[in-house]
Amino acid sequence: MNILDIAIILVLIMSAIIGFKRGAIKEIVSLVGIIVVLILAFAFKGVLGNVLCKWLPFFNFTGSLEGVKVLNILFYQVIAFLIIYSLLFSVYMIIVKISGVVQKIVHMTIILWLPSKVIGAIVAFITGYVMIFVVLLALLIPLKNTDVFINSKFANYIVFETPILASSSENISTSINEIYSLGEDLSKGNISTNEANVETMDVLLKYKIISPKTARQLIVLDKLDGISGLDKVIEKYE
């Protein structure tokens, strides 16, 4: 167990304690709201991500993926997800505050007080778990090959094996895994930087992180200048 595992446990415990204090109604509204926010964020991240890719600068990554420009596409998709999630989360917080009024009425009823507290703790634990999943997924690009993530007993399970959540983000997490494998080949000299860029594009198209149309638009905008062989990869998915 490392520091990341300890942080995860503390967040889950604190979530349950807060849920016990807040009660069932507020926590159920909270959990449903987060799930809806997640679904909408995943649904619309592609549209915003494509806009960000086209009009914001591409970065030069360091480390094993140095020179892999195409990785910027995945980076901006994650940023787009976080932007949409944050905006929707703000709306959801307003709804949670409104639900607090209903919760106060429930607490005035002695018979419902304790069950509400217990259910609130359970639901809040689940909500905390979902929030941890979102944070780990957002940090997957910088954390993936770090010792703290690799040696964590809980982080890998949460991101890659959690029922429903893992399958909903499978395209992103799987593409990151495959791209990091390409990074290892690149650092060992098994493939060139150009080949790493081309194969990364293939991964992003295969998992529908980007559409062939957007990929061609990025080429026209000179965002992927200096990379040869992209046309053949894009043609495979048109």
Label each PLM-derived region with a short phrase.
Residues 1-238:
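Alpha-helical transmembrane segments and their juxtamembrane interface "caps"
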